[in-house]
Amino acid sequence: MKIYIGADFVPTDINRSAFENGDIHTLIGPKLYDMLCTTDLNIFNLEVPLTDSNTPIVKFGNNLKSPTKTVNAFKRIPSLFLTVCNNHCYDQGFEGLQSTMNVLEQHDIAYGGIGENIHAAEKPYIFTKDGIRLGIYMCTEHEFSCANDHRAGANPFDVLESFDHVESLVNQCDYVIVLYHGGKEFYQYPSPMLQRYCRKFIEKGAALVLCQHSHCIGSREDYKTGTIIYGQGNFVFHTSAFDELHDIVDNSLLIEVDIDDAGFHVSEIPLVQTEMGIRLASPEEAQLILESYKKRSKQCENAEFIIENYKQFADTHINRYLREFLGRTWIVKVINGLTRRKLVRLLLGKTSYLGIQNFIECEAHHELFLQGLKNINRK
């Protein structure tokens, strides 16, 4: 059994016409397309609602959408399975999610990770070929898209449920792949907590844990009996939001999984962004991409590096997070500019920092703080 797994596959203004016309060669090139035609299963992350309506939800972040006609490119890919379990699947609310499901079903495209409630969304996908049963478990971090008992959406990662789900799936299948939509965007290493989560999935029996959210190639860890890949980059996702990040978003990995009598094997195929889509990397490009990838993977073997590097990464983001507590009014922006972006430091002191840490870190305060914010946002 051979499987290819790609990451974010999203039509945008740059290549929408190619998607609508089903011009798959323009999007991924003839060589890569021919490869996809030789495999038993092709898996990609559909990170956009397919809908012709405009019904955006209230959220923090962009509300994505793509016309239903863009399905014409997806249906050109043989043996296709789309995970829709991500932070953008509910950007257009229930109408957008329902439209996505309807369009995929009309074109006989298999999908998973979403549903009309959490019980439907948490169902895995099981693929069988030549007597081998492969289970695909999908979950996403919480960013306005998750289903619950009374709301449609994506299957949320839940420390009290997700590991048990994988353990149960392992008992039904020969191998299990976990598609975890999470991890910090544009960070090429695991956070300490993400590493713990992914390792726990392996300990529960998963053969491969693949993190899809970072928009960049991350690193690999071969842990116990399984493999963890902390970010594979985009597949086809062209947006101006990435313009200043070309050094890390222009390359990605197609993950190849081979299952035979000798076992479960994971390898990486480097890809390079084109003006309209993606292509196979040249031998020279592939060597450079994999050298950097292997270097980062080697660094991940050092537990102290994971902790210290993440501390440095946090220092570059903390002011952005704290600014949200001050608000987004024009007067705050003006004063922040006049103080050379030091307003947060001027207004918040040691006690405030400790208070915020306690509210976020302590389970009781965290739950109450979060529920209070949700109550405000629903008014």
Annotate each PLM feature.
Residues I14-P30, L64, T128-V176, R196, ...:
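Binuclear metal-dependent hydrolase catalytic cores centered on His/Asp/Glu-rich metal-binding motifs
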Residues P11-I14, L50-S53, N87-M101, I118-K123, ...:
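Active-site environment of divalent metal-dependent phosphoester hydrolases
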Residues P78-F81, P192-L253:
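Conserved beta-sheet core of the metallophosphoesterase superfamily
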Residues I5, P11, N15, H25-F81, ...:
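Catalytic alpha-helical scaffold of carbohydrate-active enzymes acting on polysaccharides/glycoconjugates
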Residues T39-T51, N87, E167-Y189:
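Short acidic, glycine-rich surface-loop motifs adjacent to enzyme active sites
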